[in-house]
Amino acid sequence: MSCQGAVSPKGARKLHDADVVYLYDGSFEGFLCCVYESFAQHELPFAVWTPQRETATLYPVKDIATDPAVARRVFASFGKKLGAETEYLVSRDFLSGQEDKELLLLRFLHLAFALGPGTVKREGHPVVAPLYAMKKSLDWEVDKFQGFVRFEEHDGMLGAVIHPKNYILPLLRPHFCGRFPEEDFMIYDAVHQAVLLHEKHNTRLLELAAPLELPPPSA
């Protein structure tokens, strides 16, 4: 079944709640493959977990492999069939720290593909409202950390440690790279074990396998 066919409501069987858990790698591409599986099987899983959130369950666990080609087709269908506003909202809300974000996004996408691109504007709908609540939390936290990140010098580089609820480093990147274009700096997200590293005019987002300890601040 093609990806575009999987996300089309035309001729689709009725969506059903499935006693199954999706397990994926935690990446946005991996989530898009969960979207594909959900539409292909016409099912809404009981839960969607990453390896970090995996726990004991009586439900069967379905491993969802990350396929970049499938992910690209699914994402392209958002803009083509649902519009840029939906594409933006889903992408941004995936950065939320809310544990059930994947299920909330899946429910919304099933509704949006059934009702059309105007679904995203129905902010009071019980399926749509949680997405705007996640966006509000993200926006608030981005504004907060844009103004309150405290840097110290560590071996010639500015460094800061933050503890955000949401994964906001990608959203902080434009602000701090614009603010300190000539400086070498790093922002370490101790909650999500990720680093925004700006060095010699190059910027990278790095996911770490273990917690990072910064050296003592320079005297």
What are the functions of these language-model segments?
Residues 30-41, 106-111, 174-178:
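Short, hydrophobic/amphipathic alpha-helical patches that form generic packing surfaces
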Residues 2-3, 7-68:
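N-terminal ordered "arm"
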Residues 49-144:
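Charged, alpha-helical interface segments at or near domain boundaries
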Residues 61-74, 202-217:
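Acidic, Ser/Thr-rich peripheral helices and adjacent loops at domain boundaries
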Residues 36, 180-182, 211-219:
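Ampiphathic alpha-helical segments that act as solvent-exposed interaction surfaces
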Residues 118-210:
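Internal, well-folded beta-alpha domain core
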Residues 46-49, 72-75, 184-188, 210-214:
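Glycine-rich loops and low-complexity Gly/Arg-rich segments
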